Amino acid sequence: MALFTIHADCRYEIVRKIAEGGMGIVYEAEQHGAHGFVKRVAIKVIRQQYARQPEFIANFIGEAKLVADLIHTNIVQTYHLGEAHGVYFIAMELIRGVNLEQFTQQHVQRARRLPRELAVFIVSRVARGLAYAHAKTDRDGRPLGIVHRDVSFKNILIAFEGDVKLTDFGIAKARGYLTDQEGEVIAGKADFMSPEQASFQKTDKRSDLFSAGVVLAHLLLGYNIFKAATPEESRQRVLQLPIPDFRTLDERIDDRLNAILHKALARDLHKRYASADELLYDLEHYIYHAGYGPTNETLGRYIRELFDGSGATAGPSPLMEKSTGLMLRAEHLSRPH
């Protein structure tokens, strides 16, 4: 039984749109509290056309409940699940930075190659977040069996301070939180999904490790070996493309890194990494075995220099003009006149 209950008016003022997808929109917002308290957050809102679909709403709520208990430096934190006039929204940690898609595009625009050690470091931070999520249990100590199922460039963020964050557990599966049509529909981005996903099979945590391997190969090579003209063609490449000797594609990839990539991208589950902890160990040993290696500060300096003076608008800016006036309250949605 609770000691007592606090009833508080929680108000969010939308500042600008950050990102837009097929099912939802993410905004930068100001959370207002008592005595002039203001905190910048990200607000994820369901599109109107999905707001009345019970299964979609159930998954959206399930995502919020699931991620609320995932408190880790490499996972975007969820603060609040709200509903206003039938529109559900999630208030999340605001990351001032870019996703990996924007990060790699900036390298192309500036004719730069991402240093090998930083590529490995980024994926090692993703592996840290996955290791935590995969091991998460409920209050009774029972494993939740979390599988992200969409480890991809758009769902990995790098803050300008150098923190790497995994986000969007919207199609994750976990016992008791989200409805699951696994085996009936394909979830995830075709060129980042595992062979199990691509062939409509059940997945476990090893599926996320294959996707992490795709991310690492993409960061190193500058392109995704599975990406084709259409999602279906990409899916077929995930299932059939021979995994290359990466040493022949990039002279910076040595024997040890090639072995890590092949183990992560093994189609045979028994030959793939068994856990994110195993992948993390190999990645960290690779970059730190000689002593000093990359840190968040190293990555932060690199990304700030990469985007400095480029005119890029990849990340939320605190100087952006307030462009909408949309106000979200706990049980109220209005647009001021």
Name these PLM-found stretches.
Residues 1-244:
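Conserved ATP-binding/catalytic core of the eukaryotic-like protein kinase fold
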Residues 157, 191-334:
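C-terminal lobe helix-coil module of Hanks-type protein kinase domains
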